[in-house]
């Protein structure tokens, strides 16, 4: 049975793993092999502790196309000017140097469950005894009426931290005086329920300093949201109106 990259990336908010059973030394005394797809918070943490807790008894390979991972958590503090971009960026050198993890910078393009292999976009194939899938989330092109992937450079979502976060910060800081910032909060369920409200709070902080006559409009399909009372109390105190 073969799984394409499209099939597993679109359901990628979860770590799918068969690590609940013990790994047994392979034929010829070879170490058992674990391949982790995705080097974000979930995948990198799984790879680190598999390597660390096994004390080198497991051969761990981490597949991640990017050279640096930017955390979505704390990215709102970057937008608000409380952190710089480097502080939310993490490279993979320490995973290799400190824990002996084999880091492969490539896309995982397919999985063959029967042969227990991961196919890479560059053409190589990685065999595994156990597989962890943690490739993160992304937008499905055309899933939102009137919006597609080509629009993200004009209307950055910044759900995936990095260049989108930097673009959003630049756009907020360069808004015309007295302009309007509009945010549409997603319906439940979605990743990080307080995230949209943290973000709009940081945008309000920036506009209060740089563009005090600007307006903020939030369109929200939910009647209640995470930490609603705390956010409303803070907005009334710091950004009334």
What is each residue range found by the language model?
Residues 1-16:
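N-terminal secretory signal peptides and thylakoid transit peptides that target proteins
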Residues 11, 134-135:
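Short, well-ordered coil/turn residues at beta-beta hairpins
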Residues 21-29:
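Bacterial Sec-dependent signal peptides at the C-terminal "C-region" and cleavage site
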Residues 100-107, 240-241:
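A conserved beta-strand/loop element that lines the FAD pocket in flavoprotein oxidoreductases
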Residues 135-210:
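Glycine-rich dinucleotide-binding loop and its adjacent helix/turn
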């Amino acid at each position: 049975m073969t799984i394409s990259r499209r099939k597993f990336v679109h359901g990628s908010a979860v770590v799918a793993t068969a690590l609940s059973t013990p790994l047994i030394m392979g034929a010829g005394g070879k170490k058992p092999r674990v391949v982790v797809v995705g080097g974000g918070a979930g995948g990198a943490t799984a790879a680190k502790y598999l390597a660390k807790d096994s004390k080198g008894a497991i051969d761990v390979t981490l597949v991640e196309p990017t050279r640096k991972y930017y955390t979505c958590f704390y990215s709102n503090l970057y937008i608000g000017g409380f952190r710089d971009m480097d502080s939310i960026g993490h490279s993979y050198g320490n995973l290799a140097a400190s824990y002996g993890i084999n880091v492969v910078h490539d896309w995982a393009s397919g999985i063959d469950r029967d042969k227990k292999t991961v196919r890479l976009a560059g053409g190589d194939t990685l065999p595994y005894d156990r597989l962890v899938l943690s490739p993160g989330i992304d937008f499905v092109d055309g899933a939102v009426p009137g919006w597609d992937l080509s629009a993200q450079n004009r209307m950055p979502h910044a759900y995936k931290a990095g260049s989108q976060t930097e673009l959003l910060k630049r756009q907020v800081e360069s808004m015309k005086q007295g302009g309007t910032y509009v945010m549409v909060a997603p319906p439940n369920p979605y990743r990080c329920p307080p995230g949209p409200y943290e973000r709009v709070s940081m945008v309000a902080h920036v506009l209060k300093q740089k563009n005090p006559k600007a307006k903020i409009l939030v369109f929200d399909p939910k009647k209640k949201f995470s930490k609603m009372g705390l956010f409303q109390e803070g907005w009334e105190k710091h950004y009334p109106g």
